[in-house]
From Swiss-Prot:
It comes from Conus catus (Cat cone). This is Omega conotoxin-CVIE. The presence of a 'disulfide through disulfide knot' structurally defines this protein as a knottin. The cysteine framework is VI/VII (C-C-CC-C-C). Residues 18-40 form a propeptide. The modification Cysteine amide is found at C65.
Length: 66
């Protein structure tokens, strides 16, 4: 019984993996969105330091988030 259950779960995972392939087209955008929602970050134009990585855009130039 355990072997049958393991085989069924494995088959379901393989089918799900094949169905979801290629559905995430904009990975970089999704990562930025996830970062801005999960942490407190500074908006565009806010003061920043290159070493703190606290801009929502991920870019700190000349002391301002870009």
């Amino acid at each position: 019984v355990v072997i049958v259950a393991v085989l069924l779960l494995t088959a379901c995972q393989l089918i799900t993996a094949n169905d979801s392939r290629g559905t995430q087209k904009h990975r970089a955008l999704r990562s930025d969105t996830k970062l801005s929602m999960s942490t407190r970050c500074k908006g565009k134009g806010a003061s920043c330091r290159r070493t703190s990585y606290d801009c929502c855009t991920g870019s700190c130039r000349s002391g301002r988030c870009g």
